[in-house]
Amino acid sequence: MDATAFHPSLWGDFFVKYKPPTAPKRGHMTERAELLKEEVRKTLKAAANQIKNALDLIITLQRLGLDHHYENEISELLRFVYSSSDYDDKDLYVVSLRFYLLRKHGHCVSSDVFTSFKDEEGNFVVDDTKCLLSLYNAAYFRTHGEKVLDEAIAFTRRQLEASLLDPLEPALADEVHLTLQTPLFRRLRILEAINYIPIYGKEAGRNEAILELAKLNFNLAQLIYCGELKEVTLWWKQLNVETNLSFIRDRIVECHFWMTGACCEPQYSLSRVIATKMTALITVLDDMMDTYSTTEEAMLLAEAIYRWEENAAELLPGYMKDFYLYLLKTIDSCGDELGPNRSFRTFYLKEMLKVLVRGSSQEIKWRNENYVPKTISEHLEHSGPTVGAFQVACSSFVGMGDIITKESFEWLLTYPELVKSLMNIARLLNDTASTKREQNAGQHVSTVQCYMLKHGTTMDEACEKVKELTEDSWKDMMELYLTPTEHPKLIAQTIVDFARTADYMYKETDGFTFSHTIKDMIAKLFVDPISLF
């Protein structure tokens, strides 16, 4: 793509002008939320007497974005659910929800629990819409070889699509539409809260305290996000003043949206800010090396990043020199924000960028030599690191607490299989969404073109195959997510969250490059508070 074809920012200085509510108003919101939290905590403790009630309450809190307030209580409840057989194993809704929540929290539960819901010919026997939704969502926690879950997805999707032809209760119809668009486990958690709050508000059995808390919780989080957006937008504006890079994608708000989609809890504010800056810097590097610079200039930039010292800027043409110096200054400022005990983590930010430009350099060589990787596996080995998912996910850990140790970062730099599954998902989704645009622009060969050339297929056929490979990568991720390791579970959870963001951003098109496609959802997340009445 000609760099001049990138549309300008849709937000401009909107968030620079952000003014937070008065301290008394914010204090009142916080005080009310704290009262409601304790009321809901009592409800959660009372639910331990009945497994179905406990499961319903846990999934409700998760979908409304409230579960982080009750991590200990939920973990204790699910341990009880896991060890107890006191539930109706003939109730598909309960069995599916139990399976979903236990797997989500790392408990090994066999998918054989679903075989009893099939008839003698192997067909599922269920026509209740609520049960279908529960089974469909549970089945997406599948790993390789779980044929019963593959069959469950195919069956329930057909049934749910057919159910929309009949009149459904409004809340249930909304649920079906949402689920067919994206199964529950793959949805961005903060966007799920935005979408589910009005659905929950329509439910006859809703808990008013939970509903009010969900609204207040979101509105308070939104205030934090807007403060962060003001900070990163000012940083981005300063980059533009010092570098005048008119050819790049101006997407700082979209970068922060992406990071918030993966790390939405209030306590990860520094994580979001650092990761947003890293994502923006990666975007600049990508636009420089992929669409604007000559091969010689791109290689000089890569060499300067390998050296990581101010005098390396003398290697570079003017437009790169200013950016390079701003890059170094930004990473140094991240060290200042982290403080003396965590500033060592900026070393890993530098290493991640070196990995990125090393892969980009390889892709440029392929492009210049008209080389097409012989297999998609070969392609992913080199192109996985250049999609940026590894760098962005790891940069989010830099701003997190002491639970993320030096050993954690060293492990991440070895490319464990969980990280590889993230890179593969992001690369395959990105290529499927952007292959036509990038092929027309003469950029490097994508996994889609690689498959087309190897197998002699059409682009549409190749895209379908790449979608199948994406599902295989999700199965890899689920398997690895369920495998215990010595590293904090937060790492695996965050990596899965970043896979969800890739699924959202590239579901229909390249939502990051063509950001008008996600503008309405950005407004819901950052601009429009939820009415309390």
Curated annotation (Swiss-Prot):
* InterPro entries on file: Isoprenoid_synthase_dom_sf, Terpene_cyclase-like_1_C, Terpene_cyclase_plant_C1, Terpene_synth_N, Terpene_synth_N_sf, Terpene_synthase-like, Terpene_synthase_metal-bd, Terpenoid_cyclase/PrenylTrfase
Named in its record, the pathway it takes part in is: Secondary metabolite biosynthesis; terpenoid biosynthesis
> What EC number(s) does its UniProt record assign?
4.2.3.47
The record, for SUPFAM superfamilies, names: Terpenoid cyclases/Protein prenyltransferases, Terpenoid synthases
Q: Which UniProt keywords apply?
A: Cytoplasm, Lyase, Magnesium, Manganese, Metal-binding, Plant defense
Amino-acid positions noted as binding Mg(2+) 2 in the UniProt annotation, renumbered to this chain: 286, 290
Where the record places motif DDXXD motif is: 286-290
Cross-referenced CDD domains, in alphabetical order? Terpene_cyclase_plant_C1
Give any Pfam family that matches: Terpene_synth_C
Q: Which reaction equation describes what this protein catalyses?
A: (2E,6E)-farnesyl diphosphate = (E)-beta-farnesene + diphosphate
The record's similarity note reads: Belongs to the terpene synthase family.
Query: Could you tell me what this protein does?
Result: Sesquiterpene cyclase catalyzing the production of beta-farnesene and alpha-bergamotene in equal amounts from farnesyl diphosphate. Involved in indirect defense by producing volatile signals attracting natural enemies of herbivores.
Question: What is this protein's name?
Answer: (E)-beta-farnesene synthase
